[in-house]
Amino acid sequence: MRAKWRKKRTRRLKRKRRKVRARSK
């Protein structure tokens, strides 16, 4: 389920990559 959510929001992740990385952990 997480992998699919990342692929669907892959474009937004690229913009907030720093915040996303901290949230992922």
Curated annotation (Swiss-Prot):
UniProt entry tagged with the keyword DNA repair: no
Subcellular location: Cytoplasm
Principal subcellular localization: cytoplasm
UniProtKB keywords: Cytoplasm, Ribonucleoprotein, Ribosomal protein
Pfam families: Ribosomal_L41
Annotated spans, Disordered: 1-25
GO cellular component: cytosol; cytosolic large ribosomal subunit
Cross-referenced InterPro entries: Ribosomal_eS32 (IPR007836)
DNA-binding among keywords: no
GO terms for MF: structural constituent of ribosome
Subunit structure: Component of the small ribosomal subunit (SSU). Mature yeast ribosomes consist of a small (40S) and a large (60S) subunit. The 40S small subunit contains 1 molecule of ribosomal RNA (18S rRNA) and 33 different proteins (encoded by 57 genes). The large 60S subunit contains 3 rRNA molecules (25S, 5.8S and 5S rRNA) and 46 different proteins (encoded by 81 genes).
Note from the entry: Present with 11900 molecules/cell in log phase SD medium. There are 2 genes for this protein in yeast.
Protein family according to the UniProt entry: Belongs to the eukaryotic ribosomal protein eS32 family.
Function: Component of the ribosome, a large ribonucleoprotein complex responsible for the synthesis of proteins in the cell. The small ribosomal subunit (SSU) binds messenger RNAs (mRNAs) and translates the encoded message by selecting cognate aminoacyl-transfer RNA (tRNA) molecules. The large subunit (LSU) contains the ribosomal catalytic site termed the peptidyl transferase center (PTC), which catalyzes the formation of peptide bonds, thereby polymerizing the amino acids delivered by tRNAs into a polypeptide chain.
Protein name stated in the entry: Small ribosomal subunit protein eS32A
Organism field: Saccharomyces cerevisiae (strain ATCC 204508 / S288c) (Baker's yeast)
